[in-house]
From Swiss-Prot:
Naturally occurring in which organism (per UniProt): Debaryomyces hansenii (strain ATCC 36239 / CBS 767 / BCRC 21394 / JCM 1990 / NBRC 0083 / IGC 2968)
EC number per UniProt: 3.1.1.5
Catalytic activity annotation: a 1-acyl-sn-glycero-3-phosphocholine + H2O = sn-glycerol 3-phosphocholine + a fatty acid + H(+)
Location within or outside the cell: Endoplasmic reticulum membrane
Biological role: Intracellular phospholipase B that catalyzes the double deacylation of phosphatidylcholine (PC) to glycerophosphocholine (GroPCho). Plays an important role in membrane lipid homeostasis. Responsible for the rapid PC turnover in response to inositol, elevated temperatures, or when choline is present in the growth medium.
Pfam families assigned: NTE_Ploop, Patatin
BP GO terms, sorted: glycerolipid metabolic process; lipid catabolic process
Lineage of producing organism: Eukaryota, Fungi, Dikarya, Ascomycota, Saccharomycotina
Name of this chain's protein: Lysophospholipase NTE1
Length: 1544
C-alpha cells in the first residue's frame, strides 16, 4: 500500500469517529498526480498523534472524574469497628517506633565480641621455654663463661681487663678428683661443668651426723663427703660462669707480703673471737695460721684432733652426674696472685674500683641477708665491738691537746658537772669555720682558734700563752709535737724474726690484750718493739717552712685523724712502701698515682719457692694443698702440672692415717733483709691526706640523753669519742616492737674515750643497725666526720680503700665470712627465668633490685595440639574425674596464669626449701634484676648451729601467708569461707620501684609530666628521684652509654639509687635512637605511655616510641596515660586507643595543658561539623555574630549561677580541690596507696550513696578506684564518669523519678514467664543517664560485678558500654530479665557479693571505704515443728497474739537462698584490713521507694557527715596519702592539709 493510501484511510477514520469539527481534520488526499513528500506525511502523522493524546488528558479523563464524583454511595460502620481499627493503626505505628527507632541505642551499643582483656602473657611462654636461667647454650665457650663471672669485679677498663686475663690459666678436674682450693694462690672461676664446694665440719658433728640417720635435722647423705676420717659438708654448688673463689679473697690477693705489718697479722681480730671457747685455731697447729674465709670458725670446737689439723678447710669436686654417658668433669680458670699484684701496681685506681665492688657486695648481699633475713644482726655488730677493743681504739690524745679541749668546752674542770646540768643546747659544735661557741655557758669564754694554714707557725700555739698566770712558761717557747713518740714514727723498723715469732706465740696463747700506748701514734709503729731500734731524726735538718708547723687547733685535728686512721687500719708505712715502689714501677694508665697501692711483694723472690706459697703469718713457704696427706695419695696426680693440687677420690679408701707435717722453708731471713726505704718524700703526701680529712672534722659537744644516730638512719658518719662515753642500743625490727618505748631498747656496748662509733654505717654504706646516744648523767665530746664527706674523701684518696677494706675483713667473724662465700649474687636479664615450675628447690632468693613476675602453667598437657574429646582441659590436680555423662565446658583456660609479682626486698622460694619440694611456679624477670641466693645447704647448716634462723624464716613464711589472707587470697582450699570464682587475675602489688615515662610520639611534655608526678609522689611521702639523660651523664660522664663495659657501671649506679630511694622515675626525654631511651624502657617496673587524647592519628596508628617498646619486648606493666586539656572524655574515644594496643594493661585519664604547635595541629583530624560552623561563622554578619556571642556568654553565666545555687543548696564542694588532683591519684596508684570506694546494692536504699559521696567530698577524702553492685554500680558509675558531685545528684534524681513512675512500669509489663516486665523502660532510663559512654571513658577507674548464671561465676566488668553492664548488675531476678552477653546470662551481682570488697582489694586499694545498704534478714529463731500448714501461717500473720508471726513465705525463702553467698562475703569484707565500713540507717525504706529520693539522700548525707566529723576529731581516720602534704612533715614543717573544706 502506498503512502497516499494510508493517509486517506486515516483521514476517513478520523472523520467518521471524531466528534471534533471538520476544521480540525486532516486535509484530504489529493490526486494521485499530486506529489506529496515523505516528510510532510510524517509531520502530519505526529501532529495528529499529539492532538489525540491531548484530547485524552484534557477531555476523557476529566469527564470520567466528574462522572465518578457524581455517583452516590453509603458506608455504615459500628463504633466498635471504628475503635478497633484506630487501635490497630495506632498500635502498628507504636510498634514500629518502639522497636525500630527507640531501641536503636541498644543495637548501636551492643558489643559483638567480649571486651579486650589486658594481655599480660605476651612472650611469657617463649621466655619460660627459651630463657631458662642456667641452661647451657650450644655456642657458649670458656670466654663467655669467664666474661659472665668477671662481672663480679664491676666496671673494669680495657687495660685492666687484659692485665687480669694475660696470665690466666685453666685446670680440668676429672670425676674422681678432689680439689684443695687455696684462695691465696689466685681467683678461680668455673668455666665448664658444676663444682660442689665442701667445708670441713668438726669431728663431733660428723660422728653425730653419721650415727643419727633418723634425725631429720641432720644433713642429707648426698651433702656429705668423707676424706679419711674427716667429714665435709656441702656448702654450695657453683655452676659454669660463676666465681669459685670468694670476692673477699681479692683483698688478700692485692696485699703484698709486708714484713712490717706481720706482727699485726699474727693477731687477727677474728682469730680471737669474743667467745674464747670458739677459737678455731690452736697454737700448735702446723698449718696456716691465717684465717681462711671458709674455715669453720665459730662452727667448730677448739679441741681439734690431730688428724683434723692435717686436712684442708675447703675442698671441691665436680658434681656427680647420674647419666653415665656424660663424664662429670669440670674446668676452672685461675687468675693468679701475680696478676692482681701487677694490677694494683700499674692501675691503683682500678684496684680501688674492685675494692669498692667487694664492699658493695658485702653490703648488698651479705649484710642485707644476715640482718634482714637470717636474723644474725649481732654477728655484724660484734665486729664494731671488736674494733673498739683493738689496740688503736685505746690510744688517747696527748695530754696537752686533751686538756685544751676540756678547758674550751667545760671551762674549769670542776664545773663540768655544772655544765651538764645547765646546758641549754644538746649539741655544741666547734668546726673549722667557727671561732667561738655561743651556746657554751657564760663561764666558758675561751674559743678555739680558726684553722688557717697561712698563719701557721713552727710552734704549737697554745691558749695558755695568752694567760697571765703563766709568765715565762718554758713550754710556750718550745716546739711541740702532737705525738710524744714522734721520732719513733720516722724510722725504718727491722724486727728480729725470732722476736716476731715469739711474740706471736705469746699472743696466741694469752687472751690478754697488749697494753696500749699512751701516745697517739698516727704512724705504723709496731706494738711491743722497744725504741732501741729507733733511728732518730735530726731536728736540725728541719726548717721553719716544714709542713708540720701548726697551731693548736690544727694539731688537735691532725691528732684525731691519726687516731681514726689507726683504728681504720690505715697504715702510713704500708702506704709509703707502696708509694715508693710505685715510683719505680712502669705505669701505663692515667689512673696510676704517685700515692699508689702496694706493689709486688717480694722483688722476685717468689721464683725461689715456685711450688709453694708464702704464709703471711708464719713467715714460711707452705707447700700447699694436700701435701699434708700421705704421699700414697699423690702418686697418680701430676701435681707439678696443675695450679691447684688435687687428690684422687678413689684412692681415699687406702689412706694411711699418719700425719705428715707440711714441708716448710724458713725464709724469715730472706723477707726481713729489705733495705731501708727513704720516707721523706712520702711524708708530705700523707700529711696532705690527713690535712684534707681534718678539714671535714667537726668537734661537737652533746648533752645527756641526746640521740646522735637513730636506728635505720642512712646518713650518720664517724664519731670519735674525745671525752665521755656513747651508749649503743639495738631494737629488734618486728611488728610487736614498732610502738615500744625506749625502755625496750637493749644496750649492746659502750664506746669509751678514744673509741669510734658509726663504723659499719660509714665504711660499708649500710643503714645504721643501732642507735647511738649519750648517757643520762653526762655529756660527751666527739669529733664527727659526716658520712657523705667521708665517702668523698675515700673516693678522692682511693689508695686508702684497700687498707680500710682489709681492716673490715679482719673484724668480720668466721661465720659472716662463710656466709659471704656461700651466698650467690645472681644477675638475671629482662625476660629470663629465675626458676621454672617443676625444678628442684635448691635455695631461696632475696630480690635486691628489679622485679619478678610469678606465673603458673594451667595445662600440663600443653604439648597436645589437638586434644580429643576425652582430654582433660581443666586442672583437677590429677584427680579421677568421670565426665562421660556430664556437660563439659569447652572453655579453655589460658596457658599461663599470673599470680603476682615480687619487688625489692621480698623473698622468693622459702616454702619449697622448707618443704623439700619442687618449684610450684615460674619466676620471670620483668627487667634486669639482681638477687641474693641462699643455698639450701648453707641454710640447713646455719639452722643446725643457729636454731634462731629457722625461727626467723618460719616467721617470714607465716607473715607472708597472713598477708595473703589479709588481701583476700585464701591460702588453702579448705577455707571455711566459700570461694567465689571470678574472671579476674590474682592480686599484683602496685608498689613499683622504678617508673618510666615514655611518650608515644615526640613533642609531648614528658618533662612537665615527670615534674608533676614527682611532686605528687613527694606529697604522699615517697622518697623519690627523677632521672633524665642530663642528670645521669653528670654523674657517670658523657660516655656512660657508649662503652661496652660501662653497662656494669651504669647498673651499679641504678642499684645504688634503688637502695637510696623508694621510687625512681626515669624520664625519657631523648630522641628515639638514643641509648637513654632503651635504658629507660629496660629499667622500668611500670611504663607510663603518654599520649595526647585529641590526637586521632596516633590513636588509630602506632607511635614511633611504641614500636621501639614492642621491639625490645619488655614484660613490664604498661599503662596508657591519656592527657586531656579539659576534664572531659569523648564517649567511645578511649576504646580507639586501647583496641589495637594489646601491650597496654591499663589506662589513666590525666588533665594537663599541652602546648601544641602548628605541625601537631595539622596532623590532627578536625570535625566536619566544626568546619561547617567555621565557614558559616566566617560568612555571617559581624553584628549577628556578636549578638550570638553575647547570648552564649549570658547562657554560660546563667548556667554557672544555677550550679552555684545548687552547690549552696546541696553543701557541695569547691570546683577545684587539691586532693582531687589527677597526679596525686596516679601517684597513689603507683605507690600502692590508693583509696577505693565500694558501694553496695539495696534498691532505693542506695540513694543514700549520693549523700555519702557528698560527705566524702566535703571532708576532702580522695577516691582513686570505684566499684559497685546493683544500685551501687549506678551511683558509682556516675561518680567515676565525671568525678563531680553536682552531676551525680541531678542524674540520680532524674533516674529515681523515672523508675518511680507507675505508668511506665505498667506499660512495660509482660507475661511473667521470665520476668514481670520487659526491662525496656529500665534500660532506657539507664541509657538516658550514661548514653554511649564506655567504662574505659570514665575518669576514675571503675568496675561493677554481675552474677553469670550460665557459668555460675561472678563476672567483673571493667570495659564495654557502661549502661549495659550497670543494667546487668541491677537485674533483680523475676523483676527484670537477665542481660545476655557473650552467650551468658547476667543477673544482679548482689547474689554472690553485694559488697565487692575482695575485688577492690585485688585491684590494689590500700584503704577501702565500703558503704552497705543491703536489707537485713530476720534472724528470729523459728520453731514451728516438722510440718507446716499454709492456713496456720496465714492465721498467725493476722493474729496479734501469735508467737510465730514471721514465718517466711516461698519468695522470702528463695531470696534468702539466693543471698547466702553474699552474706558470708559481707562478713569477710568487714574483717578485711584497711576497710572503713559504713552503714547508713536506711532499714525503714523498701527496695522500690525511689519516690523518697530527697529523704533517703539526706539520711545518708547526715549520717556520713556526722560520722566522719567524729572520726576526724578523735583521730580515727587512717593516714590517707594525699590528704596531708607529707613532704612538709619530712622537712620538719607543720602538718598542712591539701584541701579546704567548703563552708555549709
Amino acid at each position: 500500500m502506498s503512502t497516499i493510501e494510508i493517509v486517506s484511510t486515516v483521514a476517513e477514520y478520523t472523520e467518521i469517529h471524531s466528534p471534533v469539527s471538520s476544521k480540525f481534520l486532516l486535509p484530504s488526499a489529493r490526486d494521485s498526480s499530486s506529489s506529496i513528500s515523505l516528510f510532510s506525511a510524517i509531520f502530519w502523522f505526529w501532529s495528529w498523534l499529539f492532538f489525540k493524546i491531548m484530547n485524552i488528558f484534557l477531555y476523557y479523563i476529566p469527564n470520567i472524574i466528574v462522572n465518578l464524583f457524581s455517583v452516590n454511595f453509603q458506608i455504615t460502620l459500628s463504633l466498635s469497628s471504628i475503635v478497633i481499627t484506630l487501635t490497630g493503626i495506632i498500635s502498628f505505628c507504636f510498634l514500629i517506633v518502639r522497636y525500630k527507632y527507640l531501641t536503636r541505642y541498644s543495637k548501636t551499643t551492643k558489643s559483638t565480641d567480649k571486651p579486650k582483656s589486658s594481655n599480660k602473657n605476651i612472650d611469657l611462654v617463649g621466655s619460660i621455654k627459651k630463657n631458662k636461667r642456667g641452661d647451657s647454650k650450644s655456642t657458649s665457650n670458656y670466654l663467655d663463661e669467664f666474661l659472665s663471672a668477671i662481672k663480679v669485679f664491676g666496671y673494669l677498663e680495657r687495660p685492666v681487663f687484659h692485665e687480669l686475663t694475660r696470665n690466666m690459666t685453666t685446670q680440668k678436674l676429672s670425676s674422681e678428683e678432689i680439689l684443695y682450693l687455696d684462695e691465696k694462690l689466685g681467683f678461680s672461676i668455673v668455666v665448664e661443668g658444676t663444682i660442689q664446694v665442701y667445708t670441713k665440719v668438726n669431728s663431733v658433728n660428723s660422728s653425730t651426723t653419721s650415727n643419727s640417720d633418723d634425725n631429720e635435722l641432720n644433713f642429707e647423705k648426698d651433702d656429705l663427703l668423707t676424706i679419711g676420717d674427716q667429714c665435709y659438708q656441702l656448702l654450695n654448688e657453683v655452676k659454669s660462669g660463676s666465681p669459685l673463689s670468694s670476692l673477699m679473697s681479692t683483698l688478700d690477693l692485692f696485699k703484698p707480703v709486708d714484713p712490717d705489718t706481720m706482727s699485726n697479722r699474727l693477731f687477727s681480730p677474728f682469730e680471737l673471737d669474743s667467745n674464747p671457747a670458739s677459737n678455731p685455731l690452736s697454737p700448735d697447729n702446723t698449718g696456716s695460721k691465717s684465717f681462711d674465709p671458709l674455715s669453720s670458725g665459730n662452727f667448730n670446737d677448739t679441741s681439734l684432733s690431730s688428724s683434723d689439723r692435717n686436712y684442708p678447710n675447703i675442698v671441691a669436686r665436680p658434681k656427680p652426674i647420674e647419666d653415665s654417658n656424660n663424664l662429670n668433669t669440670a674446668t676452672i680458670a685461675i687468675i693468679p696472685y701475680s696478676a692482681f699484684q701487677k694490677v694494683q701496681s700499674k692501675y691503683p685506681k682500678a684496684t680501688s674500683h674492685i675494692v669498692t665492688m667487694v664492699i658493695t657486695r658485702l653490703y648488698k648481699i651479705t649484710m642485707n641477708t644476715i640482718h634482714s633475713y637470717l636474723g644474725l644482726t649481732r654477728e655484724i655488730i660484734r665486729s664494731e665491738i671488736q674494733l673498739n677493743e683493738s689496740e688503736g681504739a685505746k690510744d688517747s690524745l696527748p695530754s696537752y691537746l686533751y686538756d685544751g679541749v676540756i678547758e674550751k668546752f667545760y671551762g674549769d674542770k670542776n664545773n663540768e658537772t655544772l655544765l651538764n646540768k645547765t646546758a641549754e643546747s644538746p649539741s655544741v659544735s666547734i668546726n673549722k669555720t667557727s671561732s667561738s661557741s655561743s651556746s657554751l655557758p657564760k663561764k666558758s669564754t675561751t674559743s678555739l682558734r680558726p684553722l688557717n694554714r697561712n698563719q701557721s707557725s713552727r710552734y704549737v700555739v697554745l691558749d695558755s700563752r695568752s694567760k697571765s698566770t703563766h709568765p715565762g712558761d718554758l713550754l710556750s717557747s718550745v716546739p711541740l709535737s702532737r705525738r710524744s713518740d714522734y721520732y719513733q714514727t720516722h724510722t725504718t723498723i727491722q724486727p728480729d724474726p725470732e722476736e716476731v715469732r715469739s711474740q706471736s706465740r705469746t699472743k696466741m696463747t694469752s687472751p690478754v690484750l697488749p697494753k696500749r700506748q699512751i701516745s697517739s701514734n698516727g704512724g705504723p709503729t709496731l706494738k711491743g718493739h722497744s725504741s732501741s731500734t729507733t733511728k732518730f731524726e735530726n731536728i736540725r735538718d728541719r726548717t721553719f717552712s716544714d709542713e708540720r708547723e701548726e697551731t693548736e687547733e690544727t694539731s688537735l685535728r691532725i691528732a684525731i685523724i691519726e687516731n681514726i686512721f689507726k683504728i681504720l687500719g690505715i697504715n702510713e708505712v704500708s702506704n709509703m712502701i707502696g708509694s715508693m715502689s710505685d715510683l719505680n714501677s712502669r705505669s701505663s694508665s692515667v689512673n696510676s698515682s704517685v700515692v699508689g697501692l702496694p706493689s709486688l711483694m717480694n722483688n722476685g723472690n717468689e721464683s725461689k719457692y715456685p711450688n709453694g706459697i708464702f704464709d703471711f703469718n708464719t713467715g714460711k713457704v707452705r707447700y700447699d694443698s694436700i701435701s699434708s696427706f700421705p704421699t700414697s695419695l699423690n702418686k697418680g696426680a701430676n701435681n707439678n702440672l696443675k695450679f691447684y693440687d688435687t687428690v684422687n677420690q678413689s684412692q681415699l679408701k687406702d689412706m694411711d692415717h699418719e700425719n705428715d707435717k707440711s714441708s716448710q722453708v724458713d725464709i724469715n731471713n730472706l723477707m726481713f733483709k729489705r733495705k731501708s726505704i727513704p720516707i721523706q718524700s712520702f711524708e708530705s703526701n700523707f700529711y696532705d691526706v690527713k690535712n684534707e680529712f681534718s678539714k671535714h672534722l667537726n668537734i661537737k659537744y652533746f648533752g645527756p640523753n641526746t640521740t646522735l644516730v637513730e636506728q635505720e638512719s642512712f646518713n650518720s658518719g664517724l664519731y670519735y669519742v674525745i671525752d665521755g662515753t656513747l651508749d649503743v642500743f639495738y631494737k629488734p625490727a618486728s611488728k610487736e616492737s614498732e610502738n615500744l618505748t625506749p625502755m625496750n631498747k637493749k644496750k649492746l656496748y659502750t664506746v669509751k674515750s678514744g673509741g669510734l662509733a658509726g663504723y659499719l654505717s660509714s665504711i660499708i654504706g649500710v643503714r645504721s643497725l643501732v642507735s647511738i646516744s649519750t648517757p643520762g648523767d653526762k655529756g660527751v665530746i666527739v669529733a664527727h666526720i659526716p658520712k657523705n664527706e667521708f665517702s668523698k674523701l675515700l673516693d678522692k684518696f682511693y689508695f686508702l680503700q684497700l687498707p680500710v677494706a682489709s681492716k673490715l675483713k679482719s673484724l668480720l667473724s668466721s661465720q659472716i665470712l662463710t656466709i659471704d662465700y656461700a651466698l650467690e649474687w645472681c644477675h638475671i636479664p629482662a625476660g629470663d627465668v629465675l626458676c621454672s615450675q617443676g625444678d628442684l628447690a635448691n635455695g631461696f632468693h632475696i630480690v635486691l633490685s628489679g622485679r619478678f613476675r610469678v606465673v603458673r602453667y594451667n595445662n600440663n598437657k600443653s604439648s597436645e595440639v589437638n586434644p580429643d574429646d576425652n582430654t582433660d582441659i581443666h586442672d583437677y590436680n590429677n584427680n579421677l574425674i568421670d565426665e562421660s555423662l556430664s556437660y563439659k565446658s569447652r572453655k579453655k583456660k589460658d596457658d599461663i596464669t599470673i599470680l603476682g609479682e615480687y619487688g625489692h626486698g621480698e623473698t622468693i622460694g622459702e616454702v619449697e626449701v622448707l618443704t623439700a619440694s619442687r618449684r610450684t611456679n615460674s619466676l620471670i624477670a620483668v627487667r634486669d634484676s639482681e638477687t641474693a641466693r641462699i643455698p639450701r645447704t648453707l641454710f640447713e647448716m646455719l639452722s643446725l648451729r643457729n636454731p634462731s634462723i629457722m625461727v626467723k624464716v618460719s616467721r617470714i613464711v607465716a607473715n607472708k601467708m597472713a598477708k595473703k589472707d589479709n588481701i583476700g587470697i585464701p591460702s588453702t582450699i579448705s577455707s571455711n569461707v566459700p570461694l567465689i570464682v571470678t574472671n579476674t587475675d590474682s592480686h599484683i602489688s602496685n608498689d613499683y620501684k622504678t617508673i618510666t615515662i615514655l611518650p608515644t610520639v615526640s613533642g609531648l611534655p614528658v618533662r612537665d609530666f615527670a615534674d608533676k608526678l614527682v611532686s605528687a609522689l613527694k606529697n604522699i611521702g615517697r622518697n623519690v628521684i627523677a632521672l633524665d639523660q642530663a642528670s645521669t651523664l653528670t654523674h657517670l660522664g658523657r660516655h656512660a652509654f657508649d662503652e661496652r663495659l660501662a653497662q656494669l657501671k651504669l647498673s651499679g649506679y641504678f642499684a645504688y639509687l634503688e637502695e637510696e630511694y623508694q621510687t625512681i622515675v626515669y624520664v625519657c626525654d631523648t630522641p628515639l635512637k638514643s641509648n637513654w631511651t632503651s635504658t629507660c624502657i629496660s629499667q622500668g617496673d611500670c611504663i607510663l605511655l603518654l599520649a595526647d587524647a585529641d590526637d586521632d592519628d596516633v590513636a588509630t596508628n602506632i607511635g614511633e616510641y611504641e614500636r621501639l617498646l614492642m621491639k625490645l619486648k619488655t614484660t613490664a606493666r604498661t599503662d596508657l596515660c591519656l592527657i586531656h586539656a579539659d576534664k572531659y572524655v569523648e564517649p567511645g574515644s578511649t576504646s580507639v586507643w586501647l583496641k589495637n594496643r594489646i601491650w597496654v594493661q591499663g589506662h589513666h585519664h590525666i588533665q594537663m595543658e599541652i602546648a601544641r604547635d602548628n605541625s601537631v595541629q595539622q596532623g590532627q583530624k578536625t570535625s566536619i561539623i566544626k568546619n561547617i560552623a567555621a565557614k558559616i561563622s566566617s560568612r555571617t554578619n559581624t553584628n549577628i555574630k556578636s549578638r550570638l556571642e553575647n547570648v552564649k556568654t549570658k547562657a554560660i553565666l546563667s548556667l554557672n549561677k544555677f550550679n552555684n545555687r545548687l552547690s549552696r543548696r546541696t553543701h557541695s564542694y569547691k570546683t577545684v580541690q587539691a586532693h582531687k588532683n589527677d597526679f596525686l591519684r596516679l601517684a597513689r596508684i603507683l605507690s600502692n596507696e590508693s583509696v577505693g570506694l565500694v558501694l553496695g546494692g539495696g534498691g532505693s536504699r542506695g540513694i543514700s550513696h549520693v549523700g555519702v559521696v557528698m560527705a566524702l567530698e566535703k571532708h576532702g577524702i580522695p577516691i582513686d578506684l570505684i566499684g559497685g553492685t546493683s544500685i551501687g554500680s549506678f551511683v558509682g558509675g556516675l561518680y567515676a564518669k565525671d568525678y563531680n558531685i553536682v552531676s551525680i545528684y541531678g542524674r540520680a534524681k532524674r533516674f529515681a523519678k523515672r523508675v518511680s513512675s507507675w505508668w511506665r512500669m505498667v506499660l512495660d509489663l509482660t507475661y511473667p514467664v521470665t520476668s514481670y516486665i520487659t526491662g525496656y523502660e529500665f534500660n532506657r532510663g539507664i541509657w538516658k543517664i550514661f548514653g554511649s559512654s564506655e567504662i574505659e571513658d570514665f575518669w576514675i577507674r571503675y568496675f561493677c560485678n554481675s552474677t553469670n548464671i550460665t557459668n555460675s561465676t561472678m563476672d567483673i566488668h571493667e570495659s564495654g558500654f557502661s549502661w549495659r553492664f550497670i543494667r546487668a548488675s541491677m537485674s533483680l531476678a523475676g523483676l527484670l530479665p537477665p542481660i545476655t552477653y557473650g552467650g551468658s546470662m547476667l543477673l544482679d551481682g548482689g547474689y554472690l557479693d553485694n559488697l565487692p570488697v575482695m575485688e577492690m582489694k585485688k585491684k590494689g586499694a590500700k584503704y577501702i571505704i565500703a558503704v552497705d545498704v543491703g536489707s537485713v534478714d530476720d534472724r528470729t529463731p523459728m520453731n514451728y515443728g516438722d510440718t507446716l500448714s499454709g492456713f496456720w501461717v496465714l492465721f498467725n500473720r493476722w493474729n496479734p497474739f501469735s508467737r510465730h508471726p514471721n514465718v517466711p513465705n516461698m519468695m522470702d525463702i528463695q531470696l534468702r537462698l539466693a543471698y547466702v553467698a553474699s552474706v558470708n562475703a559481707l562478713e569477710l569484707a568487714k574483717k578485711t584490713p584497711g576497710v572503713i565500713y559504713l552503714r547508713p540507717p536506711i532499714d525503714d525504706y523498701a527496695t522500690l521507694d525511689f519516690a523518697k529520693f530527697d529523704e533517703i539522700y539526706h539520711v545518708g548525707m547526715a549520717y556520713a557527715d556526722n560520722l566522719l566529723t567524729r572520726w576526724e576529731q578523735t583521730g580515727k581516720i587512717p593516714p590517707i596519702a594525699g590528704m596531708i602534704d607529707r613532704s612538709r612533715i619530712r622537712n620538719g614543717e607543720e602538718r598542712k592539709s591539701l584541701y579546704r573544706r567548703s563552708s555549709i
